[in-house]
UniProtKB/Swiss-Prot annotation:
This is Fructose-1,6-bisphosphatase class 1 1. Belongs to the FBPase class 1 family. It comes from Albidiferax ferrireducens (strain ATCC BAA-621 / DSM 15236 / T118). Substrate binds at residues 124-127, 220. It comes from the Bacteria. It holds the Pfam family FBPase. Pathway: Carbohydrate biosynthesis; gluconeogenesis. The keyword Metal-binding applies. It is an enzyme of class 3 (hydrolase). The gene is fbp1. GO terms for cellular component: cytosol. It is found in: Cytoplasm. GO terms for molecular function: fructose 1,6-bisphosphate 1-phosphatase activity; magnesium ion binding. SUPFAM superfamilies: Carbohydrate phosphatase.
Length: 364
């Protein structure tokens, strides 16, 4: 096999840093620590049952749940610990927040504190672990408030409540047949494949772009009876295929891992929907804004796609709580804009179906 010379993640970050002559290097160091965490998690996922990390956490005592009320897998807890231990020590972070922790994580006193904050879902799609289907990690980097840096105080929840436009970087790792790290630092989206021989992430997918058109959509069809009118209209038109108003056939996908869905869309286009519905009116959506919707929203926009609540761009939403849930649609720009248009158009209620009485299902 001929040698192919590719940039490593380290080389890529150095090149990006040259755009900012006064940069300290702290940001690059943080991203490399995150990449190391992803490498460690990839190893644990690949070992599966051989590593003794399958099944529910604390199963012998009835199991454990996270702040979301979700049963924790052993790999959820392990992955969260890996993210913390690989990033807390270097003096790049002021604090962290995770899907698996109710409150912000404070950097221990024995370590210096930095100017960035890391928010993450350490293992997205963990319900797929036991059946050996793709899982991933997703993260976002924010700047810590200046007053926290000046005073050295601990971070509080309000410090993390920044709109997605304020993200410094976002990315995910997908643990599949190969391990890929997909990253944006605000200058496009680039994908890096883990070379198991070198132990390095190598640039394999430079300047990723999402096609504006698509023939694929992803939604959990088991919730169709709870959908409101705009999404039902969109899905019905897709399912009608070539003989319907869209005049072309669509394929429906569903992996139950947002990272895997986002990766497929970045690679070949598509649209993903996890809308607010009437299944549980107390929950304004399923996915979390700060460490799921916002990072994927930044990646989509940087790759020429779009991410939305259905009424406004996802990155413009002002968070109100650390674990806030929200309805989300993202992917190929033209399809997302079509769904937004359907939400903006008045919908006449159908007497036979009261679910269609409300206009929007992506409200935060």
């Amino acid at each position: 096999m001929p040698l192919t010379y590719r940039s490593t993640l380290t080389q890529f970050l150095i090149e990006e840093r040259r755009r900012f002559p006064n940069a300290s290097g702290d940001f690059n160091a943080l991203i490399l620590d995150v990449a190391l965490a992803c490498r460690a998690i990839a190893r644990a996922v690949a070992l599966g049952e051989l590593g003794g990390a399958m099944g529910n956490h604390a199963a012998e005592t009835g199991g454990s749940v996270n702040v979301q009320g979700e049963t924790q897998k052993k790999l959820d807890v392990l992955s969260n610990e890996v993210f913390i231990r690989r990033t807390e020590w270097a003096g790049n972070l002021a604090g962290m927040a995770s899907e698996e922790m109710e409150l912000p994580y404070q950097i221990p006193q024995q370590y210096p504190r930095g100017k960035y904050m890391l928010v993450f879902d350490p293992l997205d799609g963990s319900s797929n672990i036991d059946v050996n289907v793709c899982v991933g990690s997703i993260f976002s980097v924010l700047r810590a408030p200046q007053d926290a840096l000046d005073s050295g105080r601990d971070l509080n929840e309000a410090d993390f409540l920044q709109a997605g436009r304020q993200q410094v970087a976002a990315g995910y790792a997908v643990y599949g047949p190969s391990t890929l790290l997909v990253l944006t630092v605000g200058n496009g989206v680039n994908g890096f494949t883990l070379d198991p021989n070198l132990g390095e992430f190598m640039l394999t997918h430079p300047k990723m772009q999402i096609p504006p058109e698509t023939h694929e959509f992803a939604i959990n069809a088991s919730n169709s009876r709870f959908w409101q009118a705009p999404v039902k209209r969109y899905v019905d038109e897709c399912l009608a295929g070539q003989t319907g108003p869209r005049g072309k056939d669509f394929n429906m996908r569903w992996i139950a891992s947002m990272v895997a869905e986002a990766h497929r869309i970045l690679m070949r286009g598509g649209v993903f929907m996890y809308p607010r519905d009437n299944k549980d009116p107390a929950k304004p959506g399923r996915l979390r804004l700060l460490y799921e919707a916002n990072p994927v929203g930044m990646l989509m926009e940087q790759a020429g796609g779009r991410a939305s609540t259905g009424e406004l761009p996802m990155l413009d939403v002002q968070p109100t709580s650390l674990h806030q849930r929200i309805g989300l649609v993202f992917g190929s720009k033209n399809e997302v804009e079509r769904i937004e248009r359907y939400h903006a158009e008045p919908v006449q209620a159908e007497p036979s179906n009261p679910l269609f009485a409300e206009r929007s299902l992506f409200r935060s």
